[in-house]
Amino acid sequence: MNQDEHKIVVRRMAGLIAAASVLIAVYVLRLIFLQLVNSDSFKAQATNTTDYNFTVTAARGDIVDSAGRRIAASTTSYNVVLSKLLMGDEDLDAMLQRIVELLEAHGEKWNDSLLIGEPDAAGHYSFTAQADSTSDQKALAAMKDSLGLQQYATADDVMEKLVEDYKLESYPLHWQRVLGGIHYEMQQQAFSNVNNFVMAENVSEVTVATIKENSLTMPGVEIVETSTRSYDEGDIIPHVLGRVGKITAEKWKVTDENGQTTYPLREKGYNMNDMIGVSGLEAVYEDELRGRDGVETITRSSDGVIVGTAMTTVPEPGHTVQLTIDSAFQQAVDKALAKNIEMINSTYNSSSSAKAAAGAVVVISTKDGSVLAASNYPSYDQNLFATQYSQYSSDPGLPLLNRALQGLYTPGSTFKPAVAVAALDSGVINRFSTVYCNGVYTYYDGYRPKCTRHGHSGNIDVITAIKWSCNIFFYDVGRRTTSDVYDAYAYKMGLGTRTGVEVNEATGRLTTKNDSNYTASLDIQAAIGQGNTVVTPVQLATYAGTLANRGVRYRTHFVKAILDTNTGKVLQETQPEVMDVIEDRGDTFDLVRQGMIGVSETVSGLKNYPVTIACKTGTPQRSETYYVGSTRKHYTNTMMIAYGPAEDAEIALGIVIEYGGGGARAGNLVADIFDAYYAMKDGSLTLDETGAGETADTTADGEDAVPETVENNDALTDDTAPAEQPAA
């Protein structure tokens, strides 16, 4: 190669190198621009995915009895859920039609809270809200408000609005109503890309299988596993357990008197379609039972493809609430109460127009105030509440009424031990004090209340007065003690005041000098448990426990502990809490106990019982009357308080049987309860047993003349009441 050719090659190589250098420089600069200057923007364009977070509901904690048996639990169920995110561009109304047809074919229902029925023959609609239902009327008003309609809007106006808003004009009237109702429900549940719509709940396994089989042609229609509240024994303390239910519109959106709107449940982490405790222990312990929801994250690309799912927060189940009640003992007390009511009707009320048809029993531990049983008769089954609510609510026996905690009853002679404690402790009387009983109380001119004097007459001391329920003794001692004093003692023992139970209870009241109808005669009537005084069965049991504990009253309670659901570890345990104390300055409670032991010696079912029981009967009047010949008489309730063993009590109880008659008629019931208690202690009582066993004197003949006559002292009959009573 000559020199000229060599120069040409060198020049060409230099040019190529220069060109390559320029290209490399441009490429490097472009990389710098892409990666450093605008990297975030181009990365987003390259990936272009969106994350959507969905709530995974945590399992609700169980409620168990003192032995660990489940009473309320969360069981697996299946919901039909629509995901707007996964539905994509599908025709929503066509999809809804298909789902409805599938659900109808399997006998399922779907969520539809629109208070409008099907159109009539003329194509007009009517509201289904009940005129006398406050909740229905509130829901109707909220519906109109949410649709932007005036409150005078008709059902036709509402449907016209829904048809217009959701473009349903092309559908037949029936489908306009169906689809309009579903769209309204979607609106209520805030259906969106981040909030799924629960269309149907607790569907059958057949429905689940059918929807899964059609999943490829029904995008966004999913079966979601969830939990439903169920009750292993639906008739165990349903009134106390309470219920769970959907969050209502009123609770979700709260508007105060100034028009300020807040969403308190949303602020606590709830979704609008969540379940929540609405009454009883389910509501009181909502924060413990609820658990912590999880979060599932779904990632979708720009072209709508789901590219990833992850459980970003694992749900945590709620805590377990353990009760003080043993299910087997509770069942035994329930059956014993029903058996006693049946006995009263067959033996005493068979020809009466008023039957004993309702009652309540509360049994507590005297050691700490824990409730061992709280029975209502009649009652209901939690598992049937939703399907049989109409039947329950219209039942004249009022099975939905929590008589044990909210029933208010005149205590009758069960109140007399409280007056005795007040008189003894305040020094009005002592163990040697007597009142002369000749059958008529003559202190007031023109007012002569009577005493039947069965088993006693002459000078009566406090022990004898309690045993034979002497009205004259308590008229006089009550008058001298005054209602101000004996009421104060009664309050301390748990009467006319809250006992401390975790769920709603009635307060009751005692007769006071501030009552509008107060007279001196009312004061002495209050001393025998009549007048304006009304108490609850749980108060009677608490009061009996205070008598047994020589004046120490514990807070009455249903919850034993809060447990970790996964480990069973005790997180919180209820400790005995003293609510009040009467300082026993001598033999006050010993004397009252002796009198109450004397009562049990006269009562069928208790007089031969192997354990000494202290009790007091009561036969308070009801307002309804009947005639025996020309004599007008009042129907009466059966009342009883008891504790035992008398010298070192373990349990105390309060009993009410409406229209039961004499208080001593509950004697066999008390014996049955103690039988069940001792069977529970020795482990021989099981949940499947029929309850109480045989006790002494269980036949009708065992209810002899003695207790029947004693009962007559517990009520003031009309023939002893004056036309006018003396003023205070």
Predicted regions and their residues:
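Membrane-proximal periplasmic segments of bacterial cell-envelope enzymes
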Residues: M1-V314, S350, A354-A360, A705, ...
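Short, gly/Ser/Thr-rich active-site loops of penicillin-recognizing serine hydrolases
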Residues: K569-Q572, A671-A728
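Beta-lactamase-like hydrolase cores
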Residues: Q331-I364, S379
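Acidic/histidine-enriched alpha-helical segments
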Residues: W110-H124, N349-K367, N504-T507, H557-T567, ...
